[in-house]
Amino acid sequence: MKKIYALAFSLLFTLSAAAEVGTVSLWQVTPGKNQEAIARTTAFAPIMEEITGAQISVGMDQFNTIHWVQVYEDWEAWGKGGDALGQNNSEKFAEHIAKYPRTTPPIMTLADRFELNLVKMNSTDNANVSWITQWDSRQGQQQTTIANAMQFVPVHEKLGGNIAISADNLGNVYYANSFENWADMGRWIEVANASKDVATLWASLLTEEPVAEAVKHYRVRWFVQP
């Protein structure tokens, strides 16, 4: 099943050790290099899957940033993938590096990299686009932020959304809503904006002391999926 893992080493000890985990790398694409970046990452994904055993998703957001997501069954599999990458000198890997030599300016530059714990996966095979909201939890409030996010899942999915939630070790919680296309997403937004259930849930949370702040919204189109 295709899975989109929204943008998250967090809850390493508080979540189940069997939870799926992963690594997210964000690459800022040089202006005018979008097609080259897409071609390079599309070609590289199956090579990395073969070497590391990870399920890989790759997408691009509205900021021309590549989201490269490697997902593993658990932390042991994550560690084995890292060991394999460090030890592997396959011909395919070498050929790919040779095909895409360094350029000036570079095609893309690494902007961020972090580990994830998946709290909830989405349930669709047609998650081609995602709206991802990054919530920065106040100190000591990450668990509460996750609990609040989980309250929205049945409400949003009842309206046709497909939700994934993940978290990192910096207090961030990522809430991703995925659809087959942008038109479906737009229709869902209109329905959600008019929903009394959504409004009621927001109202109940707004009566409490805020535990997190929405700091970024990513609109991602996925062009590589497992």
Where are these regions (language model features)?
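Positively charged n-region of N-terminal signal peptides that target proteins for export
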Residues: 1-4
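Bacterial N-terminal signal peptides
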Residues: 6-16
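Short S/T/G/P-rich N-terminal loop/turn motif that feeds into the first structured element of a domain
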Residues: 18-200, 204-226
